[in-house]
Amino acid sequence: MKTPWELLKESKTKIKTTWRIAFVSALVLGLLIHLPVMLSDIPNHDGLGSMYFDQNMITSGRWFLTVACGFSSYFTIPWVIGLIGLIWLALTAAVLTEVLELKDPVTITVVSGLLVSFPALASTFAYVFTMDGYMLALFLAVLAVLFTAKYPRGYLAGAVCLAFSMGIYQAYL
């Protein structure tokens, strides 16, 4: 049995440098950009009724949203939900570098920065009570593209990822 430190050392050699750059730059830039929202709870029209919300939105076709938002809490805790959402977003940036076959660290950082600061995505932070689920949906949608583009029968895994993404939030189709 390996110790956690040995597993960490092994994982460092297995994770591509481009993925690490994308993940870290998206996480750091995301924190810098979205920290004010994560540290305060300024509810919008939906947020007022969602201080505790189990995200059971099956009538809207969001059959997987309850599970996706269940990783954090059904309570609106902006910094927890925001951090989990940023981790999903950073993973999306890493997958995006693979899809776009980016190699240059500056380009990777710029693409990661554009991803976390894009206005349509930044407005999702106003709906902080569902943000972690929505960021998981984005991750699954980009992962579906990666599987479909890179692997011979990747469309099968891509279809599963896309189905779960659509079960969370249909806008990322």
Question: Where in the sequence are the language-model features?
Answer:
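Short, Lys/Arg-rich, polar N-terminal cytosolic tail immediately upstream
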Residues: 1-15
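Transmembrane signal-anchor helices characteristic of membrane glycosylation enzymes that use polyprenol
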Residues: 14-42
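Extracytoplasmic catalytic/substrate-binding loops of multi-pass membrane glycan-assembly enzymes
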Residues: 32-50, 56-67
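Short hydrophobic/aromatic helix or loop-helix immediately within or flanking a transmembrane segment
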Residues: 55-79, 83-88
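Transmembrane-helix motifs of polytopic, lipid-linked glycan transferases
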Residues: 83-109
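Aromatic- and kink-enriched transmembrane "portal" helix at the membrane-lumen/periplasm boundary
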Residues: 111-140, 167
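Membrane-interface transmembrane helices that cradle and orient dolichyl/undecaprenyl
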Residues: 141-155
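Membrane-interface alpha helices of multi-pass inner-membrane proteins
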Residues: 155-171
